């Protein structure tokens, strides 16, 4: 069976990772883990984009060779992954020979087919975005948007890829593949963009202006445009491993959906006769008090500051709980602390402590067998009978924020159940019926805790492993079975305590 192949965008090796980079990696890792739990074999790719004018300029400014510069930056991105408990199967760099070979082969194929031609171009160029601009890119007052940085007018001969030739095909493809881009409104934005005629894509830069790139195979006086180079990574990483391509999903930011991924990439593949990816997930931006968080605006947050203070699982939980995939979301230290304290420490952490403490205190540290389920137990089981299937269905639609909300509601209900049953009171009673209720309550608490962490293990894997360990539980291979209420923990010895989410000694970073 073909592996479920999922990719992040590769990160541009021109600066340090920020919250947006971390979110994309965590989101993709959560999807990959979720699919593995469903029984799929998964191939998860990430990496770094290492060519282009900005890299060349940054290296020169530091007085070092471009390769040395990208080696250091790429390692910084690579080092981020284990800190976030993100576990890709492959990490590709566009300076690797395996990638450069495939880029050159693809360029030669398109050139031989007449899809690439040489022509003189006169127009405006953005160094920051490393792209040629059109008049429609201007602001209404005639100025250039700030995102383009310095814009200069140039005249030079270059090689162009025939985008416009395939525009009608792309429109037809998207119209006949509803839901190809997630969320659906992003696909509508792509089709809206395609209502205007496409310009052919300049896919080269003269070596006299840019040396740091992959030379064109048919003219070594030019190097490849960084976007054409970078997009090929998804294919070059697996082309020598039959059965993995096509990608099932590219997970990218909304800012690189149009035109790079939804126009350039799809047309490049179509023109070359290569099967298209099966879908694109375009996530939103993290804002900080309403402003986009990015390197260029200077308000980018270092994700490792949060990980160092609160741990990878708390960070992963917040990202998945707070952002609806595809929408923008605002990050504030205050909101992070609210989620951390109210949901992780006070809700989940409290249930863990109660379960371990009371099992140790009233049952000698061994999970009892549930005996006579009464209305409180039945109500909690009925709630889980709705919650468990919802977690799976929501995950299949990438609605992890809602799945976490439902799971935490179940944890809240379990804590309310504990208050209602009051094991500390039942433990003082000599009535055999109360002793049976006590044993049933302790078994119910432990089982509810096991189910809750099973439902969140793709988001908070470290926490799930710790909780299972203190419950003496080794999860089975079939995740759906782990989500079924049962008496799996009866007879297990539990640890007396586990501190999962300690109170922070200082506020979250600003």
Describe the residue ranges of each PLM region.
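Basic, alpha-helical terminal appendages of large translation-related enzymes
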Residues: 1-3, 17, 43, 47, ...
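Conserved, charged catalytic cores of large soluble enzymes
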Residues: 1-16, 30-44, 48-203, 240, ...
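Structured secondary-structure scaffolds
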Residues: 1-46, 98-102, 146-361, 405-407
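Active-site rim elements
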Residues: 93, 252-256, 439
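A glycine-rich phosphate-binding loop feature that marks nucleotide/adenosyl-phosphate handling sites
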Residues: 124-129, 284-286, 335-336, 370-375, ...
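Short, charged/polar, low-complexity loop and linker segments
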Residues: 328-333, 385-393
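Generic structural concept
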Residues: 345, 349, 381, 385, ...
């Amino acid at each position: 069976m073909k592996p479920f192949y999922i990719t992040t965008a590769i990160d541009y090796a021109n600066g340090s990772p920020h919250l947006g980079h971390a979110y994309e990696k965590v989101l993709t890792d959560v999807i990959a883990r979720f699919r593995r739990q469903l029984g799929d074999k998964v191939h998860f790719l990430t990496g770094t984009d290492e060519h282009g004018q900005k890299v060349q300029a940054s290296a020169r400014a530091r007085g070092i060779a471009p390769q040395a510069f990208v080696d250091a930056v790429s390692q910084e991105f690579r080092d981020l992954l284990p800190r976030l408990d993100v576990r890709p199967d492959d990490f590709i760099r566009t300076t690797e020979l395996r990638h450069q070979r495939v880029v050159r082969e693809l360029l030669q194929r398109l050139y031989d087919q007449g899809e690439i031609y040489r022509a003189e171009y006169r127009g405006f160029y953005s160094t920051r975005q490393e792209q040629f601009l059109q008049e429609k890119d201007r602001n209404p007052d005639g100025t250039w948007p700030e995102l383009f940085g310095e814009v200069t007018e140039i005249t030079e001969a270059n090689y162009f890829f025939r985008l416009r030739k395939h525009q009608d095909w792309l429109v037809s493809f998207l119209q006949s593949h509803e839901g190809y881009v997630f969320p659906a409104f992003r696909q509508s934005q792509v089709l809206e963009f395609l209502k205007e005629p496409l310009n052919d894509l300049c896919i080269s830069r003269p070596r006299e202006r840019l040396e740091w790139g992959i030379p064109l195979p048919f003219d070594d006086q030019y190097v490849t445009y960084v976007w054409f180079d970078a997009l090929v990574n998804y294919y070059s990483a697996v082309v020598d491993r039959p059965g993995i391509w096509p990608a099932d999903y590219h997970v990218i930011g909304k800012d690189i959906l149009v035109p790079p991924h939804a126009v350039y990439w799809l047309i490049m593949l179509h023109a070359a006769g290569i099967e298209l990816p099966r879908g694109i997930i375009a996530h939103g931006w993290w804002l900080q008090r309403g402003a986009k968080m990015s390197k260029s605006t200077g308000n980018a947050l270092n994700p490792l500051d949060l990980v160092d203070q609160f741990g990878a699982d708390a960070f992963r939980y917040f990202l998945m709980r707070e952002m609806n995939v595809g929408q923008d979301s605002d990050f504030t230290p205050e909101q992070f602390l609210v989620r951390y304290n109210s949901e992780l420490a006070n809700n989940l952490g409290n249930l863990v402590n109660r379960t371990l403490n009371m099992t140790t205190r009233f049952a000698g540290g061994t999970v009892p067998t549930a005996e006579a389920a009464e209305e409180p137990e039945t109500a909690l089981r009925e709630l889980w009978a709705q919650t468990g299937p919802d977690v799976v269905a929501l995950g299949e639609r990438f609605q992890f924020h809602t799945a976490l909300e439902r799971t935490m509601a179940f944890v809240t209900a379990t804590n309310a159940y504990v208050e209602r049953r009051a094991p500390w009171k039942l433990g003082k009673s000599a009535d055999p019926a109360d002793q049976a209720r006590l044993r049933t309550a302790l078994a119910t608490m432990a089982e509810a805790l096991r189910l809750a962490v099973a439902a969140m293990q793709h988001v908070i894997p470290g926490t799930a492993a710790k909780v299972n360990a203190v419950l003496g539980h080794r999860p089975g291979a079939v995740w759906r079975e782990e989500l079924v209420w049962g008496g799996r923990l009866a007879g297990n010895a539990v640890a007396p305590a586990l501190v999962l989410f300690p109170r922070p000694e200082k506020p979250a970073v600003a």
